[in-house]
Regions:
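Single-stranded nucleic acid-binding surfaces, predominantly the OB-fold ssDNA-binding core
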Residues: 1-101
């Protein structure tokens, strides 16, 4: 099956965040950005994406307004709150950013 190629416009790029894991003591870093699907529709979809570890460099050189082709995985995690309610959290982990300008 051929991979679907969708182009996005970069809307916002947040700064790199970093720290040390309390659980493992390892250093971590991440960076988020917002991209909007380039489509001929009235309300295009936007997605919040996260780059982690050395992948934070993938967005270096990309500016707000640039057109990019992205590779990312979307993952939902379910968890129980203290009162027993099931909640869900979604992560969109980006692993490819290709500048198309």
């Amino acid at each position: 099956m051929e991979e679907k190629k969708i182009l996005y416009k970069v809307i916002e790029i947040m700064p790199v965040e970093s720290g040390t894991s309390q659980a493992t003591g390892r250093e971590w870093k991440s960076r988020e950005f917002v991209a909007e699907e380039i489509a001929d529709v009235q309300y295009p979809n936007q997605v919040l994406l996260r780059l982690s570890g050395d992948d934070v460099k993938l967005i270096d050189g990309v500016k707000v307004g640039d057109t990019v082709e992205l590779g990312f995985n979307s993952r939902v995690r379910s968890f129980q709150t203290k009162d027993g309610k099931t909640m869900h959290s979604q992560e969109n982990n980006c692993w490819r950013v290709g500048l198309r300008n």
